Amino acid sequence: MVPEKMAYVLAALIFTISMVYFVVAWQAIGEMASAETTDEKLGSKMEVSLFSIVGCSYLGMGAWILMKKLYTPIPYAIVAIGSAVMIGIYMVAITSGVPVLGVETEADPFATIAKILQGGIIGMAVFLIPSTVRISEKMPKINR
């Protein structure tokens, strides 16, 4: 596939995962309303904050990629690293647990969807980084 078209596919994946994170944040708001203890409320507040920030960050990165296309590798690197960090946080949450939240015991379909999308985002972003470097080398140099 042509790298220019892959940038659009990557942006579509990024916008999709941002919507997934907003849905998960909305679910956490519902859990916060039904929380009984202060620890449960604190955990829900942390989840809402994390998922809202991640969703907004993905929206910003998707917009940056659409605006700059293949002229800079920076948003591709940020998206790949950020997605890897989110997968790492999820792995910690299901194995050893997060201090306030504890170990994640429920099998959440949104978490599975998010991790599949993030794997695709990492693969596409890493694949597109060399294309950005080649395109920027072909650009004319400005003599000042």
Where in this protein do the model-derived segments appear?
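Membrane-interface extramembranous regions
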Residues: 1-144
